[in-house]
Amino acid sequence: MALTTENKMLKIEDLHGRVHDYLRISITENCNLRCTYCMPAEGINLTPKSHIMTADEIVSIAKTFVALGVKKIRLTGGEPLVRKDARTIIERLGNLGVELTMTTNGLLVHEYIETFKAAGITSLNISLDTLNKEKYKQITRRDHYDALWKNIHLLVNNNFKVRINVVLIKGFNDCEILDFINLTKDVNIQIRFIEFMPFNGNQWDKSKLVTYAEILEKIHTHFPLENILRTEDKPNDTAKNHKIKFYAGSFSVISSVTNPFCGTCNRIRLTADGK
């Protein structure tokens, strides 16, 4: 990484010429779910609480990165909203004058609607891998499906842009691709299909991978090709964007296994312990 100036503005540029202006901050390793593809059944060894960044440290680091040209900050976890001082962190980061957003499992967002609005958060990514209540319980090892959907409706009704992240696993939820697409018919939400990635302890198996090509092929079985529109990708976007003609919402595919996107990466990732 190196600092360069362009029109007297600082920016962070790596050895490959990529400018990094998007900061992802994990504010906790804790989560109130136990998703099978994310966490082994026996759990994981968490970093000691004394090593986790304080709210002051998070805000101080974020301010430094904003001064170095960062334009967008995303809060992640674990589940960011289980952190006890999450509200304070959100409020303080909302004063930095950059785009602020979050990836969450959605279970606690009802407690933060007004905080989100005050901090300028207008969109959230919600993790939801199935539309089947029993499958949800199976994959998350928790029974919160109805509560999650109540919160998704709450976000939509409060005019937040909702993007639903769906990790596809062959033989488990790939049969629901069209069901997810149909969610976009009348509601302006975005479904983001994510290829199942290797992760330490998640029992990754290549045979469980549903590829970008297979996802589109499945959609083609129900919609004529001319009705599946390829829409514009944003610069440095990790997703390939599409929508069904005349549908209110859209869908995209993050093909991180079959089409790695590191060449245009603009992200800086900060772990909960500041690394």
Regions found by a protein language model. Give the residues of each.
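A detector for short, charged/polar N-terminal pre-domain segments
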Residues: 9-15
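Accessory C-terminal segments flanking Radical SAM cores
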Residues: 200-275
